Swiss-Prot record:
Residues 27-213 form a propeptide. This is A disintegrin and metalloproteinase with thrombospondin motifs 8. Its cofactor is Zn(2+). GO terms for cellular component: extracellular matrix; extracellular region. Zn(2+) binds at residues 363, 367, 373. Its EC number is 3.4.24.-. The spacer domain and the TSP type-1 domains are important for a tight interaction with the extracellular matrix. Residues 138-210 are annotated as: Disordered. Residues 438-525 form the Disintegrin domain. GO terms for biological process: extracellular matrix organization; negative regulation of cell population proliferation; proteolysis. The gene is ADAMTS8.
Length: 889
């Protein structure tokens, strides 16, 4: 665990923070909260010695002389702001910035300190006689001769220090269509557009190799910000400041404790596209623009997560208007869901509309972090209606500042991180661009007329006759045309925080408040864990369930950007570990059977019977409920998580807990060291059984008995090795019950692919006939006797290579002689005529909606060669329609 950085003494910390300031021109280096007095001043240049710059300020009844020298020592080598110009090559913008920064003293006092930027006016801060002062330009130009606001903050240290990253470390969504244009007498109209490949997202869960589970850890979302040519043309020299301000607003939203995690947005690189031919292809098709941008941004990312320029997600900002269904052009952003650690898909596209784009950015980044819309079926099923005032509301109306994140958003994010799908966020960046921390409405970039131009276009400005109730709460804008109607958007379009709204008053969260109240220092409070809650309900009534206890980060709750709690947020223990009464069904099988009553039918209208599917399931998906139609290859994922306490697989004792495989013993206790011995006895010493092994002697054509394995046998392993260079040597394993029913490769129908064989709750795993080592395995006690056979097809002679082993309880009467005697009575005669030989059905060609399944149907003669003498009228079908789950609209 990396320790949190110790707090250094004031002077070096102030120097570092204030030197970072000019990247966000006009923003104070520390939160603008609590200024005591301010005056407008015009800096004047004084003669200075060689290599020194002297500036004079007059305010508060006295003069200030700043003697400054160049100082860019705080800029890390990794610092990157790049531009794509006419050459198509990225050129660094930091070289010019390095000449912006100066530090020095005030009025010759050795204990004073000044740190400022001289690019685009004078921005920065200084300390003198125990008081702190900040200065920033009030105009849009870059001259020193323009008015600047000098603000006095009282004793140094009276304002809260900015919160840096927490270094302490303890793992196709739809487009967002939030706003529609309105005239003042129009009704609010909006529709939600689904992007390409959109679907209702399942909770992002799966098994993981991480050892830490249900732990709150600091996460760092390393971000590439890209502004296209339309942004560069619209904002000009203010572009960098604008996009960093958007990110600053979004970062504050992600610091709110309602997100239930420690999320830090970090900008590692800004890329400004000055020539559109070198940028991503942007059009009014939001989905297509996203695909183009995702492909384009990959060239700038470093593959190693440890590289200082590596980023976890890329965001494109554009002035392009996106149009969707029925020609509606009110889509504001688009992103794929749950792609945060996928370098090919972790990206989003944002339509810039001034400061409002910060909320769109936060929303689309939420999709990338796996959050669905608040009105999606999974959210409403779990939490009910959640209103329209959270970040992930499908339509942006007004953000609930006290609870910006819905419980559903917090849950999906937590499951993404606890499931190990956000491990790329665990590393803190080596260097990140500082974000503005002041009130944006204080800057010339966001004066009222500028806010109107950014949202509606260059010909708009603020309506002068705004009603008293709309001051700060609703931005109305108009043009100077023949009919100067006032326009607005959404149910709520508040003025930028910090916008002057009257003498001595500023806007704050849609209200006009006294300036001293808006800028009053807000104490920063780190969060603390509340006591552990009671143990919850056990997930099972027998066989080893799991119960949870949780604790919340609300003692105290983080306030004003304070750190969210780090450490374990949930703990679990085993419960009801007694064995279940034997019923011949596994717990996973019972979960699949629940869907037998649903309207899933075959071509003849018969209800399908569902059994667990293990074969072909990736290790990370073992805790999803995969079920296969009995006797068919069709399968479905019915649940994103099996019930806690379900075995991860037939060959392991590990159990699923919240979608993750965790270690457990044969006594059904989590983290227990107890294991099954070779006899299948929990904690046994392996002395209650004996080993049986053997091999097959030369056989006749047809089905030949190898061995009949008695009930109670464990650790069964039957192997048939193909001859080198021969894919089909004419020998295949088969399996049948005591009453003669075939479970595997019977009636000359060979299973080429891996499959599971379910026998009264016990699974036998079959490798498939195409495997070089054809294998049949089972690890748990066999519930009934089974006969293993070898099918030998006439043709080129390849002697079989079959070996088998298993363990039989000492009290079971079994001898190899009796097995061999039985084997001699079950020899099948050679095939006498050509027959149709069937392969297994393929998977459905479509993951949703209608598709097709295919299989091989071949006519083979008694020698196994292709033949044309089979009865074509009796040829089985080789294709059939299949239907997976309905495709989302």
């Amino acid at each position: 665990m990396l320790p949190a950085p110790a707090a250094p003494r004031w002077p070096p910390l102030l120097l570092l923070l204030l030197l970072l300031l000019p990247l966000a021109r006009g923003a104070p280096a520390r939160p603008a909260a609590g200024g005591q007095a301010s005056e407008l001043v015009v800096p004047t240049r004084l003669p200075g010695s060689a290599g020194e710059l002297a500036l004079h300020l007059s305010a508060f009844g006295k003069g200030f002389v700043l003697r400054l020298a160049p100082d860019d020592s705080f800029l890390a080598p990794e610092f990157k702001i790049e531009r794509l110009g006419g050459s198509g090559r990225a050129t660094g913008g930091e070289r010019g910035l390095r000449g912006c920064f100066f530090s020095g003293t005030v009025n010759g006092e050795p204990e004073s300190l000044a740190a400022v930027s001289l690019c685009r006016g004078l921005s920065g801060s200084f300390l003198l006689d125990g008081e702190e002062f900040t200065i920033q330009p009030q105009g849009a130009g870059g001259s020193l001769a323009q008015p600047h606001r000098l603000q006095r903050w009282g004793p140094a240290g009276a304002r809260p220090l900015p919160r840096g990253p927490e270094w302490e470390v303890e793992t196709g969504e739809g487009q967002r269509q939030e706003r529609g244009d309105h005239q003042e007498d129009s009704e609010e109209e909006s529709q939600e557009e689904e992007a390409e490949g959109a679907s209702e997202p399942p909770p992002p869960l799966g098994a993981t190799s991480r050892t830490k589970r249900f732990v709150s850890e600091a996460r760092f979302v390393e971000t590439l910000l890209v502004a296209d040519a339309s942004m560069a043309a619209f904002y000009g020299a203010d572009l960098q400041n604008h996009i960093l301000t958007l990110m600053s607003v979004a970062a504050r939203i992600y610091k709110h404790p309602s997100i239930k995690n420690s999320i830090n947005l970090m900008v590692v690189k800004v890329l400004i596209v000055e020539d559109e031919k070198w940028g991503p292809e942007v059009s009014d098709n939001g989905g297509l623009t996203l695909r183009n941008f995702c492909n384009w941004q990959r060239r700038f990312n470093q593959p190693s997560d440890r590289h200082p320029e590596h980023y976890d997600t890329a965001i494109l900002l554009t002035r392009q208007n996106f149009c969707g269904q029925e020609g509606l052009c009110d889509t504001l952003g688009v992103a794929d869901i749950g792609t945060i650690c996928d370098p090919n898909k972790s990206c989003s596209v944002i339509e810039d509309e001034g400061l409002q784009a910060a909320h769109t950015l936060a929303h689309e980044l939420g999709h990338v972090l796996s959050m669905p819309h608040d009105d999606s079926k999974p959210c409403t099923r779990l939490f009910g209606p959640m209103g329209k005032h959270h970040v992930m509301a499908p339509l942006f109306v007004h953000l609930n500042q006290t609870l910006p994140w819905s419980p559903c958003s917090a849950m999906y994010l937590t499951e993404l991180l606890d499931g190990g799908h956000g491990d790329c966020l665990l590393d803190a960046p080596a260097a990140a661009l500082p974000l503005p921390t002041g009130l944006p409405g204080r800057m010339a970039l966001y004066q009222l007329d500028q806010q109107c131009r950014q949202i509606f276009g260059p010909d708009f400005r603020h309506c002068p006759n705004t009603s008293a109730q709309d001051v700060c709460a609703q931005l109305w804008c108009h043009t100077d045309g023949a009919e100067p109607l006032c326009h607005t958007k959404n149910g709520s379009l508040p003025w930028a925080d910090g916008t002057p709204c009257g003498p001595g008053h500023l806007c704050s969260e849609g209200s006009c408040l006294p300036e001293e109240e808006v800028e009053r220092p807000k104490p920063v409070a780190d969060g603390g864990w509340a006591p552990w809650g009671p143990w919850g309900e056990c997930s099972r009534t027998c066989g080893g369930g799991v119960q949870f206890s949780h604790r919340e980060c609300k003692d105290p709750e983080p306030q004003n950007g304070g750190r969210y709690c780090l450490g374990r947020r949930a703990k679990y223990q085993s419960c009801h570990t007694e064995e279940c009464p034997p019923d011949g069904k596994s717990f996973r099988e019972q979960q699949c059977e629940k869907y037998n009553a649903y309207n899933y039918t075959d071509m003849d209208g018969n209800l399908l019977q569902w059994v667990p599917k293990y074969a072909g399931v990736s290790p990370r998906d073992r805790c999803k409920l995969f079920c296969r139609a009995r006797g068919r290859s069709e399968f479905k994922v019915f649940e994103a998580k099996v019930i806690d306490g379900t075995l991860c697989g037939p060959e392991t004792l590990a159990i699923c807990v919240r979608g993750q495989c965790v270690k457990a013993g044969c006594d059904h206790v989590v983290d227990s060291p107890r294991k099954l011995d070779k006899c299948g006895v929990c904690g046994g010493k392996g002395n209650s059984c004996r080993k049986v092994s053997g091999s097959l002697t030369p056989t006749n054509y047809g089905y030949n008995d190898i061995v009949t394995i008695p009930a109670g046998a464990t650790n069964i392993d039957v192997k048939q090795r193909s001859h080198p260079g021969v894919q089909n040597d004419g020998n295949y394993l088969a399996l049948k019950t005591a009453d003669g029913q075939y479970l595997l490769n019977g009636n000359l129908a060979i299973s080429a692919i891996e499959q599971d064989i379910l026998v009264k709750g016990t699974i036998l795993k079959y490798s498939g006939s195409i495997a070089t080592l054809e294998r049949l395995q089972s690890f748990r006690p066999l519930p009934e006797p089974l006969t293993v056979q070898l099918l030998t097809v006439p043709g080129e002679v390849f002697p079989p290579k079959v070996k088998y082993t298993f363990f039989v309880p000492n009290d079971v009467d079994f001898s190899m002689q009796s097995s061999k005697e039985r084997a001699t009575t079950n020899i099948i005669q050679p095939l006498l005529h050509a027959q149709w030989v069937l392969g297994d059905w393929s998977e459905c060609s479509s993951t949703c909606g209608a598709g097709w399944q295919r299989r091989t149907v071949e006519c083979r003669d008694p020698s196994g060669q292709a033949s044309a003498t089979c009865n074509k009228a009796l040829k089985p079908e080789d294709a059939k329609p299949c239907e997976s789950q309905l495709c989302p609209l």
